[in-house]
Amino acid sequence: MSSISRDEVAHLARLSRLSLTDDELDEFADQIDGIIEHVQKVSNVDTEGVEPMSHPSDLAGVMREDEVHPTLTAEQALDQAPASQRDRFEVPRILGE
């Protein structure tokens, strides 16, 4: 069974722009090894004669006609908002200019 090395985890962290401590590198290497082990177990399951499926249930999508129901007006929806502008919620900027 192949296992992922600490150096490979460090390489993945660099590619992902993550800064990991030595303890985190060891911990993640162990976790990834566990994941790989589980995937290998699933890969070894005998699926001979099992038809491929996209969903474990035979349920089909149930369609219905859209029904219009009363909704809040913009004024009602914004009534308790801390800030609004032009009938929209105003929120603090989280991304740069």
Swiss-Prot record:
Query: How does this polypeptide assemble, per the annotation?
Result: Heterotrimer of A, B and C subunits.
Provenance organism? Corynebacterium kroppenstedtii (strain DSM 44385 / JCM 11950 / CIP 105744 / CCUG 35717)
Which EC numbers does the record give?
Answer: 6.3.5.-
- Report the sequence similarity comment from the record: Belongs to the GatC family.
- Name the Pfam families for this protein: GatC
Q: Which reaction does it catalyse?
A: L-glutamyl-tRNA(Gln) + L-glutamine + ATP + H2O = L-glutaminyl-tRNA(Gln) + L-glutamate + ADP + phosphate + H(+); L-aspartyl-tRNA(Asn) + L-glutamine + ATP + H2O = L-asparaginyl-tRNA(Asn) + L-glutamate + ADP + phosphate + 2 H(+)
Output the superkingdom of the source species: Bacteria
**Protein name according to UniProt:** Aspartyl/glutamyl-tRNA(Asn/Gln) amidotransferase subunit C
Query: What role does it play?
Result: Allows the formation of correctly charged Asn-tRNA(Asn) or Gln-tRNA(Gln) through the transamidation of misacylated Asp-tRNA(Asn) or Glu-tRNA(Gln) in organisms which lack either or both of asparaginyl-tRNA or glutaminyl-tRNA synthetases. The reaction takes place in the presence of glutamine and ATP through an activated phospho-Asp-tRNA(Asn) or phospho-Glu-tRNA(Gln).
GO MF annotation: an example: ATP binding
Q: Where is the composition biased (Basic and acidic residues)?
A: 85-97
Transmembrane regions listed in the UniProt entry:
none
Extract the Gene3D superfamilies matched here.
Answer: Glu-tRNAGln amidotransferase C subunit, N-terminal domain (1.10.20.60)
Q: Region labeled Disordered — which residues? A: 74-97
Name the keywords, alphabetized.
ATP-binding, Ligase, Nucleotide-binding, Protein biosynthesis
Lineage, uppermost ranks: Bacteria, Bacillati, Actinomycetota, Actinomycetes, Mycobacteriales
Query: Which top class of enzyme applies to this chain?
Result: ligase
Report the record's Gene Ontology biological process terms.
Answer: glutaminyl-tRNAGln biosynthesis via transamidation; regulation of translational fidelity; translation
